[in-house]
Design a protein with these regions (language model features):
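Alpha-helical oligomerization segments with coiled-coil/rod-like character
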Residues: 1-70
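Catalytic cores of peptidoglycan-degrading enzymes
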Residues: 72-203
């Protein structure tokens, strides 16, 4: 009857509201987790940079920096794909906001990810919401970060050359779908906008 119909409708509305609230809380938690991973990455880079500077102070021989300010606008893209999100603050899922310290490049799962410059693998492993992550050191305080990989094909301490495959695209289960999260960190661990450093893509 009419009363039961209204009761069922109200029950469905209540369930929908609960599911919406659960979805929003889950989205907020994912954003919080991503921000925590960014902070952990910054801590890792700071530790690596301290070790590099201590080695310099001891007179250790160092290779020439392979990324410098002369590299602006010249670095190759680490993977073929489309730009999903840009450096800086951006809308997140379910009306959240997230500040990206790099860019997201959408590409198929398993697509090869290549080093944008020669360097040394200084960190490789699982990093929470960023999944498998590889960090390369390029000298002069510059680092590149390749995250949301399905796997890494390099190991800690490996030297790599520009264009060498270091892993493959993963991230199919993320809000953005399969993609590479790519960052460039400069002196003093400052996150730099990769689009200023990568070659301009033809429209």
């Amino acid at each position: 009857d009419e009363l039961n119909r209204y009761s069922d409708l109200e029950t469905r509305r209540t369930q929908d509201l609960r599911e919406t609230r659960r979805g929003i809380r889950a989205a907020q938690q994912r954003v919080t987790n991503s921000e925590k991973e960014e902070n952990r990455l910054t801590d890792v880079i700071a530790r690596l940079e301290r070790a590099r500077r201590e080695a310099l102070a001891r007179g250790a021989a160092t290779a020439r920096a392979t990324i410098t300010t002369a590299s602006l606008g010249t670095l190759p893209w680490p993977v073929d794909g489309n730009l999903l999100y840009r450096f800086g603050p951006a809308p997140g899922p379910d009306n959240t906001e997230i500040t990206w310290h790099g860019v997201g490049i959408g590409s198929a799962v398993g697509a090869p990810v290549r080093a944008v410059a020669s360097g040394t693998v200084v960190d490789v492993g699982e990093r929470g919401t960023y999944l498998t992550t590889v960090i390369l050191q390029h000298g002069g305080g510059y680092y590149t970060i390749y995250a949301t990989l399905s796997d890494a094909t390099v190991h800690l301490g490996d030297p790599v050359v520009a264009g060498e495959v270091i892993g493959h695209v993963g991230g199919a289960s993320t809000d953005q779908g399969s993609h590479l999260h790519f960052e460039i960190r400069g002196p003093d661990q400052i996150a730099l906008d990769p689009l200023n450093w990568l070659q301009k893509k033809q429209p």
